[in-house]
From Swiss-Prot:
The active site is at 187 (thioimide intermediate), 194 (proton donor). It comes from the Bacteria. It catalyses: 7-aminomethyl-7-carbaguanine + 2 NADP(+) = 7-cyano-7-deazaguanine + 2 NADPH + 3 H(+). SUPFAM superfamilies: Tetrahydrobiopterin biosynthesis enzymes-like (SSF55620). It comes from Haemophilus influenzae (strain ATCC 51907 / DSM 11121 / KW20 / Rd). Keywords: Cytoplasm, NADP, Oxidoreductase, Queuosine biosynthesis. InterPro entries: GTP-CH-I_C/QueF, NADPH_dep_7-cyano-7-deazaG_red, QueF, QueF_N, QueF_type2. One of its GO terms (molecular function) is preQ1 synthase activity. The gene is queF. Pfam families: QueF, QueF_N. The lineage of its organism: Bacteria, Pseudomonadati, Pseudomonadota, Gammaproteobacteria, Pasteurellales. Homodimer. This is NADPH-dependent 7-cyano-7-deazaguanine reductase.
């Protein structure tokens, strides 16, 4: 997918950068959601009514007022209705800028991050900063559903093709949760691989799992950000399968101390953040 937009030309992705020695909110860089939504025809009216980009930030550190380093892990929920998503490398550089800066306590850091991220995204952002004790007991979790990956099929094309979903439903009405660990796309700017687990929960006509798997695999050489891929999958399923209810949720592997987990639904509440085996 080729995008031509001035907002992408200024991004730090793919460029040599220096790490800031002191806290700097100006390091954050926005990417307009309209960049992808215009092409999908959903800039004004999205088919999903609930959603967030759920980030886990593992590399957070700052100094307390006595100069002693502090560490934490953050859960960050960026509302789908925000004007912008946040470019991941700029997010990493921003978080690194806290390393040698003094803050009074956890709450001061959390409030600072929430303010800065909300301003960059031009929308609602929730930040929960967790001390290490919270994550010491966190288990490796999984997304519930039937895995569609173990099918004995031959794949010869890895170019994105939404037409794999054409005529993908039967007349049987079901409620299903389907999982694939084979979602792989590429960064829009750097072409680096993005590896994810895809979760689909729907109510409606039964979706043919072979067609769905071929569609998922077709993302393998596709270039878009994580958030854009999930919105594309949601729109394609609504167009071809026309379910009564739909949730699309992807959890991507960690890069640069961050994992990004976009969630879009027209009927389910936002999930609690969790951690999969590959995260």
């Amino acid at each position: 997918m080729n995008y031509q937009d001035n907002s992408l030309k200024s991004l730090k992705l793919g460029q040599k950068t220096e790490y800031a020695s002191q806290y700097d909110r100006t390091l954050l860089q926005p990417v307009p959601r309209a960049l992808n939504r215009d092409g999908l025809g959903i800039t004004q009216n999205q088919p999903f009514t609930i959603g967030a980009d759920i980030w886990t930030a593992y590399e957070i550190s700052w100094l307390n007022e006595k100069g002693l380093p502090q560490v934490a892990i953050a859960d960050i929920y960026l509302d789908y209705q925000s004007q912008n998503l946040i470019e991941s490398k700029s997010f990493k550089l921003y978080l690194n800028s806290f390393n040698q800066s003094k803050f009074a306590d956890f709450n001061a850091v959390q409030q600072t991050m929430q303010r800065d991220l909300s301003e960059c995204a031009q929308g609602d952002v929730k930040v929960r900063l967790n001390p290490m004790a919270v994550y010491d007991s966190q288990k490796i979790d999984h997304l519930q559903g039937d895995c569609i990956d173990e099918q004995d099929i031959e794949i010869t094309s890895y170019e994105f093709n939404a037409n794999w979903l054409k005529d993908c439903v039967s007349d049987e009405i079901v409620e299903e949760k389907l999982v694939s660990h084979l979602l792989k796309s590429n960064c829009l700017i750097t072409n680096q691989p993005d590896w994810g687990t895809l979760h689909i929960h729907y109510v409606g006509k039964k979706i043919n799992q072979e067609k769905l798997l071929r569609y998922v695999v077709s993302f393998r050489q596709h270039n878009e950000f994580h958030e854009q891929c999930v919105e594309r999958i949601f729109c394609d399923l609504m167009h071809y399968a026309k379910p009564e209810k739909l949730t699309v949720y992807a959890r991507y592997t960690r890069r640069g101390g961050l994992d990004i987990n976009p969630f879009r639904s027209n009927f389910e509440n936002l999930p609690e953040n969790l951690r999969l085996a590959r995260q």
